[in-house]
Amino acid sequence: MKLSCLLLTLAIIFVLTIVHAPNVKAKALADPESDAVGFADAVGEADPFDITKLNIKKLTKATCKVISKGASMCKVLFDKKKQE
């Protein structure tokens, strides 16, 4: 049961990371009337992110809240399973 709680917590962190990641747009730079040997380039543009504006305290608090809620949910499930 402890392993599944760890996996659940990691899955939640993974999903939150994907949701809060900056948007990346890919654009094809090809001639519209190109032949079958034409080329395509993908250009990614991300929002600028300044690491100095990152509030570590808020980020740490939010991460701890998510992990503690996940742990408490796992504890409740584990206790229910133990009673059965």
UniProtKB/Swiss-Prot annotation:
The keyword Isomerase does not apply. It comes from the Eukaryota. GO terms for cellular component: extracellular region. Residues 22-48 form a propeptide. GO terms for biological process: defense response to bacterium. It holds the Pfam family Pilosulin. It is found in: Secreted. Residues 1-21 form the signal peptide. InterPro entries: Pilosulin (IPR049518). Its main location: secreted. Expressed by the venom gland. Keywords: Antibiotic, Antimicrobial, Secreted, Signal. Shows activity against E.coli and S.aureus (MIC<6.25 uM), moderate activity against P.aeruginosa (MIC<25 uM), weak activity against B.subtilis (MIC<50 uM), and has no effect against L.garvieae, C.albicans, and S.cerevisiae. Has no hemolytic nor cytolytic activity. Causes an IgE-independent histamine release. Belongs to the formicidae venom precursor-01 superfamily. Ant pilosulin family. This is M-myrmeciitoxin-Mb2a.
